[in-house]
UniProtKB/Swiss-Prot annotation:
Protein name: Voltage-dependent L-type calcium channel subunit beta-1
PANTHER family for the chain: VOLTAGE-DEPENDENT CALCIUM CHANNEL BETA SUBUNIT
Taxonomic placement: Eukaryota, Metazoa, Chordata, Craniata, Vertebrata
Biased segments, Acidic residues type: 548-559
GO cellular component, one term: sarcolemma
Gene3D superfamilies listed in its UniProt record: P-loop containing nucleotide triphosphate hydrolases (3.40.50.300), SH3 Domains (2.30.30.40)
Amino acid sequence: MVQKTSMSRGPYPSSQEIPMEVFDPSPQGKYSKRKGRFKRSDGSTSSDTTSNSFVRQGSAESYTSRPSDSDVSLEEDREALRKEAERQALAQLEKAKTKPVAFAVRTNVGYNPSPGDEVPVQGVAITFEPKDFLHIKEKYNNDWWIGRLVKEGCEVGFIPSPVKLDSLRLLQEQKLRQNRLSSSKSGDNSSSSLGDVVTGTRRPTPPASAKQKQKSTEHVPPYDVVPSMRPIILVGPSLKGYEVTDMMQKALFDFLKHRFDGRISITRVTADISLAKRSVLNNPSKHIIIERSNTRSSLAEVQSEIERIFELARTLQLVALDADTINHPAQLSKTSLAPIIVYIKITSPKVLQRLIKSRGKSQSKHLNVQIAASEKLAQCPPEMFDIILDENQLEDACEHLAEYLEAYWKATHPPSSTPPNPLLNRTMATAALAASPAPVSNLQGPYLASGDQSLERATGEHASVHEYPGELGQPPGLYPSSHPPGRAGTLRALSRQDTFDADTPGNRNSAYTELGDSCVDMETDPSEGPGLGDPAGGSTPPARQGSWEDEEEDYEEELTDNRNRGRNKARYCAEGGGPVLGRNKNELEGWGRGVYIR
């Protein structure tokens, strides 16, 4: 009976097997064998299970074995588009190498590219740190600029725009929040309670400071627009407007004019550019306060001077500013100028005292003010200065400055970029001069372009030493001789006529050295009249720079014998006592006669 039932059930699976083989005849032998194996292992047939497994397996194979033509075509299209975009980006990068610099920025944040940043060309993004300088050539798209890091050996690449940096910052903050949440959830109760206790003990003071830091970081932009070439500004050894400081800075200006002839623009700035703070210029409510205060410069004059400096820097020439009002690096720390601060340092206060006293009573009576200003500069950390010139010999200090500026020139002028057009530079400098305000109208166009005119100081006075780090009410500075200052007292700086009275006629006839046989056209103020050069007010004959070792009796004879600038042995800073300075007390005056600020 059992056999009959088994025999009667036999045709059913065979009848079920036929349509399956018709549906898919190709795997007939394989699946027939598989079914035979099931029969031998089990006493009864399991055709339902076999057929179900067959259908499931067949459907999976049909799904995976069917390559989606649309997916393949999409992938190919995406790859082709990516390669084409990369090719165009590389071509645009290559063209940007010879394009002029559109503008420059100073970074407030750092950037290290990662694969997920979607750089137009992988591996060509620029890495930079905070306080680096970037030359921007052009805008590639809304997320990326094309430019280069101002550093020797760096080529053009892709720089994230402020929009891109903000988006990357937001993504990073989201990841940090998620990590904190996951770490807090994974922590056990004991660690969380311990963390609460620790944070509870710190809650009284830090939250306010943390909020302040958060606000300050939120409002800081990633980039600050700065001049394409950082302007060079000299400070020290004491206050400007006094003979010792003026003649030392004048010697360096003379050196720069000849060493970088054709590559430097030297211009005088009489406006108080320390007022050009971003917080002041961007806040209209502060404009009224400054306009009402007793300042020597209006905001319109300051803004005009800043624009003129930016225009001069666009030529990619070196720009040196003879700024009357800048005596401390803190005055420019919050401006957009980002200058190269050169600190002329006299290490020994005794040497500075001897130099001041050697200039006569007119300078000695202001000894305390100058010493206090020198001490104020000496207290600054070295990070506030780009170059510190503390050499004893003038020529050593000049070479130190020249090495720094040569390196900066190479960093701003890579070999791949085309050299600037001298005619364009001269035209732009002259145009910038024409747009300059009245206080700097005495500047000459050729002097801005190639440094052919002499520098000039105006009669004026200085504020107290404690005022020059940037107080808005009483900014320091020089006042034009045609506008006598309203303040007077022991802190009043000497007028130019006062300083000349302390010198001999031979001192007033001396001038700085000119290369070759060229003459120097002396500029004079209306209040001075003749007396800087010859009695008729003409030009001063070229002379070599004096040395502290020159004897007073031999000075007039040496002026006619030695006119070679290369033989200059002038020493502008010395350490120690008398034996280091020279042979007698009169040798301190040789500096002032050989190189005198006009």
